[in-house]
Structures are given as structure tokens and as C-alpha cells.
């Protein structure tokens, strides 16, 4: 189907840059599309066909380690996807894409510097984490989060790795800015039985957009 893109042109003196915004949960005016129903192939292909030179994804995640509290904004440098969901443009021909390092190193380095400055973090602050892809649309159980922690996941979400796989197939540089919007199930300090609420999660993410804007503005000057 059609993919709605918002195109903007920013200028500074004689220099002009174009920014294309895509809401991954777009649903043609209806309520947001649930994560397991997002048409990732259409979204990434639309960005590629629009001539994007790179992608800065913004993700709301549930955090597992103590050094990634709600409100902190960091980066993904690896992902783990055991969902069994296929994300590829190559359904007919056997083509195999390397994702040893799935995220663009140049973009991540630039964004890490911006995020440190925007949040007053020193050089010791950890800024890169492993994203665990959950099937969704349900949040995880405490037992699932414990297992994810054991297997090396630091944050959980329901979308992003499906995008970066497709971007890699198109050689489209991709970075993921991740907003810790909540503690993952069972990790709320002092209340391991705290229920997760979608609206509270979204509200926390929306309150932490300033570092995200700083990243975007920096990329437009690169």
C-alpha cells in the first residue's frame, strides 16, 4: 500500500538539506498500526526510493540493566531476533546479507557524541546496548525478561531489527536512537509486579525528545 512520507527542507544560508519523516505505525488515518502488522518492507523501500542517504530510527524501549533507567536516550549497537519473522526483500532468490555489525559505525559515532553532550554524560557513561526484538503486541513476562537478560539483551522492543535488516539489504546506513521509556517487566525498583501501561510508556518517550532532536539537527549538518 501507500506509505505516507513527510518531506521538509531545511536551509542555512545557501546550504539546503532535506529531511524525510516516516511514522512506522502509520495506518492511513486509523489508530496506530500494531507492531506485528507494520509493513516494514514498504516503509524501508519508500525511504530508499525517496533517495534517503541514511536512516535515524527512533525507538521506545523497555530497559533491563540498572545503567539504562527510564529517561535515558542511548543507541543500539547489536540486536537479537528469535521471533522467526522473516524480514527480507529476497523471497525468490537466495541472497544472504551480512549483519555482523548491523548499525552504521559512522552514524553511531556521531550520534553517541551528540547524546553525551545533550544529556551531560561523561566519557564513562555507557551509551550502546543490545536490542531484543519481542514479537508483540503484548509486553513481556518477568520470566521472559529474566531469560532475555541471561541471553544478552539489554532493552526490549517490538519493531526495529526488522527495519535494520531490510536497510542492510539495500546498503542504506541505519542507526537506532533508543529512548528508555520504562523498566522492563519485573525490573521496576521496589515493585517487581508493576504492570506496564502503553500510554505511560508513550508519555515517557515523548518527554525525552530533546536529545533526539539534537541528533537529527547534527546529522543535517554532516
Where are the regions that the model predicts?
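Generic hydrophobic/aromatic pocket-lining and core-packing "Φ" positions
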Residues: 44, 145, 161-164
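Zn-dependent metallopeptidase/amidohydrolase metal-coordination segment
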Residues: 158-198
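His/Asp/Glu-rich mid-to-C-terminal helical/loop segments that flank catalytic regions of hydrolases
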Residues: 184-222
